[in-house]
Amino acid sequence: MKNVLKFIAFATLTFTVAVAQAQGKKKPNIIFILADDLGYGNVHSFNPNSKIPTPNLDKLTEEGIKFTRFYSGNTVCAPSRCALMTGYTMGHAWVRGNAKAKDGLAALRAQDTTLAERLKGNGYKTGMFGKWGLGDEDSKGAPHLKGFDSFYGYLDQSHAHDYYTNRLYEIVGGKTVEVPVDTTKYTEDLIVNKAVDFINANKDQPFFLYLPLTVPHAELKVPAELLKKFQHADGSSKFPPETPFEKKGNYDSQAQPHAAFAAMVNKLDTDVGTIVALIKKLGLDNDTYIFFTSDNGPHKEGGADPVFFNSSGEFRGVKRDLYEGGIRVPLIVRAPGKIAAGQVNPTPWAFWDVLPTLGELSGTATPKNIDGLSFSPLLSGKKAVKDHEYFYWQFNEDGLKEALTKGDWKLIRFKNKGTAEKLELYNLKADIGEKNNIAAKNPDTVKALYALMKQAKTPSENPRFDWSEIEK
């Protein structure tokens, strides 16, 4: 009897210690790196024919999992980031398009709870460094009101075109304020340095680092020493023929746009390497998930040449298109000890799934009413508990565009005010380049997908993105 009591006491103690250890277990750090206008084909591990070396991203791919059918929230900046932060598709999101700076309707509302707010509520230190795009300093969408303890960077996409600006924004004293910047400094360097400081300052506690870098978005401008990597000794470009870009709108002139774009992608790759090296140096490798993706497809502004660089890979379209090239983006996730290296996964998922996925990884509660689903099981080689029936996007510049995918089928709708709609149907398995519109040959499929397209959206509550007039 005495031995039985000893065994029970030992077992009870062991269980108590195990529970205490589980309860006290450190939540994983999460680093989410978001490139700006980087095409699927600009990452060498996603496109072996890429002209630009990306050794750090390739290494990240080797050490983690590569998703080959991951979708952005939209085909331009602000709405894509809205989907990422809130978990809503373009059929339900508050921000469904880009807008000018200081436009209050382009900012998140108080009730639009973000990923950062949820993680902060679960004990995470939260930092963002780069381009926000979802609210100015005096709006309800300012970074300090959307869950970030630290922020340094740009508030709107127009300002973010300037890589040698005289001002950025920072959270100081609990508020987002303008801070002066030395115009001889390349802002990408300043932003990455702040991210490094944030990691060092929070290495002993769970942190969420959101790093929405601004490269390789136009304008095509880099420091001379970075440009030299893609120039011959005589100063000529390693990527001829070059067509000089003359200043237009917000974008400054660039004599060698090919070399400059390559240098910007290389800079992005180097910055990713800096973050990964720091995590290793601090011994945080086994406690940290690193995500890398892009906000939409490649741009063609400011002298950029996505055709020359095969920036969309095998896909049709670029930024502002709802063809695959405008919305299919690279996704790499690395977490040694948690994610087996060298995986390739073709499961489709999207920006609005990031919030619930990170929620499950971190033990953070996820709201029931959002569009996103958790795909965290994919990271450990398992199947998702639930898949989406379909994926939906809408975008309005030069008329309304909508797209919906279901399995291998994809329907795209074009509509301008006063004109009849145009429908295009593609089978992505048979025609990944979306070259052959087979809508006329498949009326039943068109009808079924069209019905889902109506089901996937509600009229926008935001008058800035109310496109009901276009439907007339």
Regions found by a protein language model. Give the residues of each.
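Formylglycine-dependent sulfatase
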Residues: 2-9, 20-424, 428-472
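Repetitive helical segments and hydrophobic/amphipathic motifs
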Residues: 11-15
